[in-house]
Amino acid sequence: MRLRNGTVATALVFVTSFLTLSWYTTWQNGKEKLIAYQREFLALKERLRVAEHRISQRSSELNTIVQQFRRAGAETNGSKTALSTISDNTIKLLKELTSKKSLRVPSIYYHLPHLLQNERSLQPAVQIGSGRTGVSIVMGIPTVKREVKSYLVETLHSLIDNLYPEEKLDCVIVVFIGETDLDYVHSVVANLEKEFSREISSGLLEIISPPESYYPDLTNLKETFGDSKERVRWRTKQNLDYCFLMMYAQEKGIYYIQLEDDIIVKQNYFNTIKNFALQLSSEEWMILEFSQLGFIGKMFQAPDLALVVEFILMFYKEKPIDWLLDHILWVKVCNPEKDAKHCDRQKANLRIRFRPSLFQHVGLHSSLSGKIQKLTDKDYMKPLLLKVHVNPPAEVSTSLKVYQGHTLEKTYMGEDFFWAITPTAGDYILFKFDKPVNVESYLFHSGNQEHPGDILLNTTVDVLPLKSDSLEISKETKDKRLEDGYFRIGKFEYGVAEGIVDPGLNPISAFRLSVIQNSAVWAILNEIHIKKVTS
């Protein structure tokens, strides 16, 4: 009898374990499918947004055509000879369109009037590839003749060899040869066709070069910022090269990432970039940075490229590209009546840095004649000590003593982790929003890989509603109100605090982390995510 009972018990344990395992497997598979569906939905949403922008662009182009017809009509002055080849319906339509006295909008020809001298000035002189469109990411690589060594082939191998087969179908790499010597251009093309024939025929790799008529006269440029005439010419031409490449790439995909011809990449870089961008699809970012060096690894949304190109063309003679990019952000969000810190906070929401870096600069000999540049990205090999999120613009402060420049401001802007000496009761970390925010959830993570024991203990999460009185909240939430008007909504457990914000508390004016007991260890804050309610 005991044996039978034991057998039954064993069978029950086996069946229970099997059912539990089956349930967990089903739940896990369902969770993975849900995440995959969410990513597909975000990708579709981005494609629709880009399509809407391109429809608007086409409308603008049609308006430009109307203006050209108006000018042509004025020049011919109604000449019967000029109109003899056009149908009556077309003439009637053109008269209706051109009869409106609309103002003329400045175009690329205003900044580069020499382009009007040749109708092919904005058409590639050389164009190799199948013209792939509809991809997620377009990678742009400008290259010019180098006196000592070319790194282009090694760069392309690094980019292509680190792509999975399905990723090779979802991107296009555009090599821009910024030279007008066609013999040299054709020699580069021949070399790339020999080395990457499969990638070119499949549509993954394209090669273009500009016509000589694209470039203005670069011999009499004003020397600025202490740069030599040669360097001013080099950086001016570089700005024009970037613009041509961006104009060519803008209709090929959802995102455009600027690379250089002397870099290497990390494994899984494509998936990392794409997922990071999709996570931020509800945010109004303008630049995602995947390297801290110059213009390497800077990614834009395709609809923003027109603005970027137009801004660069307005000042292409004045400053180098990285300065101009910073000026675009300043113009968009900085208030001249506010201080530099406020401006930096605003720009940090448009220019978001991903860490660790995915691209490393390896070129020693610059494309500028005689220049040696030993530039390397120090974040390329670093372990991930900070996880970056986009948070609402806020003024941050703390009573904690900061260790070696690991400030709270840098953490909130995604530049570095926060590190403070032993917290004591009464210490705080405060995030005061520039404008009240409707918050959905929060996550604060302390400690990191190098110092896992430096975590926040005995610390609470408090929020300050815009209106502490007359809130429509539950009795349970009301009981969490503190004397200073804050509400205690959570606490750190094992170094982590996360939770959902009661919608009745919104909008929120501030978040505060309050230390309620002395700590025996230092504290690192390596992740801050105050997630806004998505509309």
From Swiss-Prot:
It is a single-pass type II membrane protein. Pathway: Protein modification; protein glycosylation. The keyword Nucleotide-binding does not apply. Residues 28-63 form a coiled coil. It is found in: Golgi apparatus membrane. N-glycosylated. The keyword Cytoplasm does not apply. Residues 28-535 are lumenal. It holds the Pfam family MGAT4A_C. Keywords: Coiled coil, Glycoprotein, Glycosyltransferase, Golgi apparatus, Membrane, Metal-binding, Phosphoprotein, Secreted, Signal-anchor, Transferase, Transmembrane, Transmembrane helix. It comes from the Eukaryota. The chain crosses the membrane at residues 7-27. It comes from Mus musculus (Mouse). It catalyses: N(4)-{beta-D-GlcNAc-(1->2)-alpha-D-Man-(1->3)-[beta-D-GlcNAc-(1->2)-alpha-D-Man-(1->6)]-beta-D-Man-(1->4)-beta-D-GlcNAc-(1->4)-beta-D-GlcNAc}-L-asparaginyl-[protein] + UDP-N-acetyl-alpha-D-glucosamine = N(4)-{beta-D-GlcNAc-(1->2)-[beta-D-GlcNAc-(1->4)]-alpha-D-Man-(1->3)-[beta-D-GlcNAc-(1->2)-alpha-D-Man-(1->6)]-beta-D-Man-(1->4)-beta-D-GlcNAc-(1->4)-beta-D-GlcNAc}-L-asparaginyl-[protein] + UDP + H(+); an N(4)-{beta-D-GlcNAc-(1->2)-alpha-D-Man-(1->3)-[alpha-D-Man-(1->6)]-beta-D-Man-(1->4)-beta-D-GlcNAc-(1->4)-beta-D-GlcNAc}-L-asparaginyl-[protein] + UDP-N-acetyl-alpha-D-glucosamine = an N(4)-{beta-D-GlcNAc-(1->2)-[beta-D-GlcNAc-(1->4)]-alpha-D-Man-(1->3)-[alpha-D-Man-(1->6)]-beta-D-Man-(1->4)-beta-D-GlcNAc-(1->4)-beta-D-GlcNAc}-L-asparaginyl-[protein] + UDP + H(+); an N(4)-{beta-D-GlcNAc-(1->2)-alpha-D-Man-(1->3)-[beta-D-GlcNAc-(1->2)-[beta-D-GlcNAc-(1->6)]-alpha-D-Man-(1->6)]-beta-D-Man-(1->4)-beta-D-GlcNAc-(1->4)-beta-D-GlcNAc}-L-asparaginyl-[protein] + UDP-N-acetyl-alpha-D-glucosamine = an N(4)-{beta-D-GlcNAc-(1->2)-[beta-D-GlcNAc-(1->4)]-alpha-D-Man-(1->3)-[beta-D-GlcNAc-(1->2)-[beta-D-GlcNAc-(1->6)]-alpha-D-Man-(1->6)]-beta-D-Man-(1->4)-beta-D-GlcNAc-(1->4)-beta-D-GlcNAc}-L-asparaginyl-[protein] + UDP + H(+); an N(4)-{beta-D-GlcNAc-(1->2)-alpha-D-Man-(1->3)-[beta-D-GlcNAc-(1->2)-alpha-D-Man-(1->6)]-beta-D-Man-(1->4)-beta-D-GlcNAc-(1->4)-[alpha-L-Fuc-(1->6)]-beta-D-GlcNAc}-L-asparaginyl-[protein] + UDP-N-acetyl-alpha-D-glucosamine = N(4)-{beta-D-GlcNAc-(1->2)-[beta-D-GlcNAc-(1->4)]-alpha-D-Man-(1->3)-[beta-D-GlcNAc-(1->2)-alpha-D-Man-(1->6)]-beta-D-Man-(1->4)-beta-D-GlcNAc-(1->4)-[alpha-L-Fuc-(1->6)]-beta-D-GlcNAc}-asparaginyl-[protein] + UDP + H(+). This is Alpha-1,3-mannosyl-glycoprotein 4-beta-N-acetylglucosaminyltransferase A. GO terms for biological process: glyoxylate metabolic process; N-glycan processing; protein N-linked glycosylation. GO terms for cellular component: extracellular region; Golgi membrane; peroxisome. Its EC number is 2.4.1.145. InterPro entries: Glyco_transf_54, MGAT4_A/B/C_C. PANTHER family: ALPHA-1,3-MANNOSYL-GLYCOPROTEIN 4-BETA-N-ACETYLGLUCOSAMINYLTRANSFERASE A, N-ACETYLGLUCOSAMINYLTRANSFERASE VI. Its cofactor is a divalent metal cation. GO terms for molecular function: acetylglucosaminyltransferase activity; alanine-glyoxylate transaminase activity; alpha-1,3-mannosylglycoprotein 4-beta-N-acetylglucosaminyltransferase activity; glycosyltransferase activity; metal ion binding; protein homodimerization activity. Signal peptide: none annotated. Disruption phenotype: Mice display impaired beta cell glucose transport and insulin secretion causing type 2 diabete. This is due to defects in SLC2A2/Glut-2 glycosylation, provoking SLC2A2/Glut-2 endocytosis with redistribution into endosomes and lysosomes. The modification Phosphoserine is found at S474.
